């Protein structure tokens, strides 16, 4: 399924904002691919379309503990009083308070309370209480969240460790390797994108045979390449093997440890964990998927998931409803080609029902930036008349007052056109995709200009 270069990048950025599968690791993979490092070894980086679940750090750390992976001692607090009690219980001179928000860049973020930084070192239970009170119940604004920010409902209170060295370690599924791959670097605790861009040779990898599984010598080899001292190579390898087993057990698409460290006592610890899970495994990973925190998601993401619709919000003014991810991105590109900006990626899939089409329109029109809508359907498995029924129902029920341009081709297209024509609604039909894109761009510009001038524009255009 081909993905356009332009909107591959746009969707990656949007996925980061909505905490979908595009992570720092995938961004690094893209940079690595561009660097020529993979080509040098006869490998290719391929982006894979997946819907994934991300969990809070404290939940990921609990999974690591259950798997026998070495992690710092810590507990989650949902109030400042709980943070005080945990800090006292840990009995350490200093502890770390980490805001539990599903967004990268926490350390450089700012809370609506005015507190700067979502990761703080404190030196007493009293200070733990004071700092956590400025985090819990407040929104953390980072580069990834945008101005809206994300609510912080709890904090992780954990013991502070003093690392001698920091490393980066991750496991991901990569099609070009035909299975999982371990990725490591001696440069941990920093943005892996920067490492990949500035020093790609610092990143090492070890493909794993999905049938044979991970071998200890593979983990040992990677640990050595990452620069672990000889006296703790075996310990690092053991943690990598346990992480790989966790990766398989829970149908993860990515496990990222940044940093994995050698602490002042010479022990290997995983200081931070990000785990993404394949949403296709929800039926057999109920324990994991019941942990999803919907307060961290855009309300439209939740509605889309409930309706089984692939949706990602963008920043444009033209709503898109398409069947098939490849056609959806091609549609977005042709809108951009003619000077428009898509407001979303929306794929209703090959077997959409009338209800799903209606739900798709609800998602699109809930975005107040949308000034016009383009429906582009190529009916193979998907019947055009079903789409048409959904369009007519949605336009009526939602009282849509912005232009709707429809381009239908394929199965039962004549029945679909008849349904639209007989509806009496001002839905604009167009057989040619290029013409449909030009039309929706012009109409969105007219609506935008009219709203800016406080003019009420009514579209009385023939079908």
Curated annotation (Swiss-Prot):
Species: Mus musculus
Sites bearing Phosphotyrosine, chain numbering: 84
Binding site for Mg(2+): 258, 272
Keywords of the record: Acetylation, ATP-binding, Ligase, Magnesium, Metal-binding, Mitochondrion, Nucleotide-binding, Phosphoprotein, Transit peptide, Tricarboxylic acid cycle
PTM sites of type N6-acetyllysine: 78, 88, 129, 139, 143, 216, 368, 438
The protein's name: Succinate--CoA ligase [ADP-forming] subunit beta, mitochondrial
Chief location: mitochondrion
Residue span, ATP-grasp domain: 61-288
First-tier enzyme category under EC: ligase
One term under GO cellular component: myelin sheath
Amino-acid positions noted as binding ATP in the UniProt annotation, renumbered to this chain: 98, 105-107
UniProt binding sites for substrate: 323, 380-382
Molecular function terms, GO-annotated: ATP binding; magnesium ion binding; succinate-CoA ligase (ADP-forming) activity; succinate-CoA ligase activity
Sites marked Important for substrate specificity: 94, 162
Modified sites of kind N6-succinyllysine: 88
Sites of Phosphoserine modification: 279
GO biological process, one term: succinate metabolic process
Annotated compartments: Mitochondrion
Stated role: ATP-specific succinyl-CoA synthetase functions in the citric acid cycle (TCA), coupling the hydrolysis of succinyl-CoA to the synthesis of ATP and thus represents the only step of substrate-level phosphorylation in the TCA. The beta subunit provides nucleotide specificity of the enzyme and binds the substrate succinate, while the binding sites for coenzyme A and phosphate are found in the alpha subunit.
Cofactor: binding details: Binds 1 Mg(2+) ion per subunit.
Record-listed E.C. numbers: 6.2.1.5
InterPro entries, A to Z: ATP-grasp (IPR011761), ATP-grasp_succ-CoA_synth-type (IPR013650), ATP_grasp_subdomain_1 (IPR013815), Succ-CoA_synthase_bsu_CS (IPR017866), SUCC_ACL_C (IPR005811), Succ_CoA_betaA_euk (IPR034723), Succ_CoA_ligase-like_bsu (IPR005809), Succinyl-CoA_synth-like (IPR016102)
UniProt pathway annotation: Carbohydrate metabolism; tricarboxylic acid cycle; succinate from succinyl-CoA (ligase route): step 1/1
Modified residues (Phosphothreonine): 341
Catalytic activity: succinate + ATP + CoA = succinyl-CoA + ADP + phosphate
